[in-house]
Amino acid sequence: MARHIMAVCVVCLLCAHRLHCQDHIESLLGPARVTTHNSQDQLNARVYTNLSPSSETTDRRQQRSASGDDDTFNYSISPPSRREKRHAGHEHGPTSESRVPQITQYYLEKLMAQDELMNSSGFDGLLQQLSLHSLASGASEGTCVPGSRLVHHVQPHDHHHAHHHEEEDHSLQLNNCTLIQNGTTSNVICPSLPNNNTHPLGKEAKNFTLSDKDLLHLCPILLYELKAQSGGCIEPAILSDIDTTEELLEAEKDKDIFYVWIYAFISVFACGILGLVGVAIIPFMGSRYYKYIIQYLVALAVGTMTGDALLHLLPHSLAGQDERGMIMKGLGCLGGIIFFYVMEHALTMISEWRKSVEKKETKKPSRAKVMRDPDSSVNNSVAGDKICKQKYSSYPYCYDEITMNNKQSEWMHLPFDVAAGAGGDAPSVAELRNGVGDHDGSNDMAAAAESLISPLHTNCVEMNHHNHNHKHNSHQQNHEGQDSNTIVTDLDGNAVYAVNKAKDKDSRNDHVTVILREHESSHHGHSHRHGHVHSPPETLSAVAWMIIMGDGLHNFTDGMAIGAAFAENIAGGFSTSLAVFCHELPHELGDFAILIKAGMSVKSAVYYNLLTGVLSFIGMIFGIAFGQSQDVAQWMFAVAAGLFIYIALVDMMPEISASHKSLGQFLLQILGMLSGVGIMLLIALYEGDLMSAFGTAGAASHQHAH
């Protein structure tokens, strides 16, 4: 309704400024005579109907254009500078270019005299022509509000600073203005303000400029003054009441900021505390239901993160944008996706560089253990069983043997007696190279042995040295005569070792663990299998460093998204917090599992998870601080939407797409994704009601805009 009033207001304002409305209607309708009973219908028809340029002759149009009185929609002569927008309805107010009707924009351009801004002298001239002399600067002599103060209230300003200078003058004003009517004229007489020959807001406030949006804001005020026939005299007490209302709204905003910090802190704390959940689920990791629960949680995270990105973050980032602004916000979303891709791969490259440096500084081991990974894609491809292999983890594989402290020293003891080992029952290195073995997989083991022994293949295996102190001295003495260069494997439960005649007492306890992993890809009815060597993490410090960097990056961006969402409105903040919570649950479980399987204690794993959670609070502070600006908040929403889309579709979607062997698993994953999308959809649809429930100051304006 307000939009239509503004459209008519601009037309009437132009009519009063240029010529009488009756003459204007006659000029629009050409030679047709306008009668009293149908003038209103013809005016409405002209306002809401675009007449064809052929309704007037070419000579008449050119004559009117030359005289400067061309008030028709003669786009064939001077087309409007603004073209129609393909998108509308993205602004939370009636002043957006995408919501301004074409007729309003056309007359605004004529009022602005083809300039983008109207200066103070031009506005005073407009007030004089409208017979609103009391609003003209210097004409009120302190009895009425001057036009400069009126402009100050419709333009963005520091309310607290202005109110500090005005409240003393307002306190001297009495609410006993009288209306004096003399025939057809009316004047309002109010008590005079102290005349100090100085504008209450300063001399600089007398010189101002008006944009087309400012003029739209002033139109209802000017139209009301024309209707009241008061000569444009606005009581100062009215502005005093308006200032009081604005002050109350500012106080409500300050109160909302307090709750924004509280809710954001609670949300980030709830997401960060999920690192402790890993301690509680340790007894249930071996349960048959664990992998199904993880699959549902990962699918739920995919639904919530994509839903929050597409149903909440992106719509808010595009609100009130013109076509160019929408394109730039979409570019920001793409930038978030590319940024996260570059950062993840940069961390991987740095990790590989660190391991290569450590490998060069470490001597080659004298013993090596070669084993087949029981969790390789050939043996097991269920995502629930590979939860520690998700892309969030610092290392993509689990190393069970590292944590088997009770078996770390046993694998070095040869399963055969000394005579058997010395007598040649065990295959030699040469036999392994030739592919001789008594079990399947010896060729793979031989290749690994070759890579360990040959200096040309030292870059194929990364070394992990362990120094073991054996408690049984007699047992060590029995094996003291064994060869110091031994390769052992547990492929399919069998043990294979290679003997070298060189003996080195000092290096007999140095060894390296090598993991053989077979990968299989199936498509079009056939499959391909290949195997290569993986190594466990070099040191626990490398694992901890990668966890802090990778997980810390996720937590910082999550905290920033939560802070910016709460700064925009509390309901949207809870929507983003729920999406982050659903994403963090399987994420933290995966990080906790990789730390435990890398040999860390439970206490250390919890410490590292909580340490990375601190970055969430830092991101939250950045989000709330910069989210106070609407423009900055929209950019943050666009980038956060890109980050959420990348995490959901690149990091988490492969975890569930790789495990849909059974119909039950497929239905469970679909249920999780639909649940996440449904939750985000409900929050997006009823966001205004949620804002009202939390009592935010912007709830009323938000609901009014929609």
Curated annotation (Swiss-Prot):
Signal peptide range in chain numbering: 1-21
Q: List modified residues, type Phosphoserine.
A: S376, S377, S381
- Which keywords describe this protein according to UniProt? Cell membrane, Developmental protein, Differentiation, Glycoprotein, Ion transport, Membrane, Neurogenesis, Phosphoprotein, Signal, Transmembrane, Transmembrane helix, Transport, Zinc, Zinc transport
Per UniProt, the ranges with Polar residues bias are 40-56
InterPro entries reported for this sequence? ZIP, ZIP_Transporter
Family, as annotated: Belongs to the ZIP transporter (TC 2.A.5) family.
> This protein is called what?
Zinc transporter foi
Q: In which organism is this protein found?
A: Drosophila melanogaster
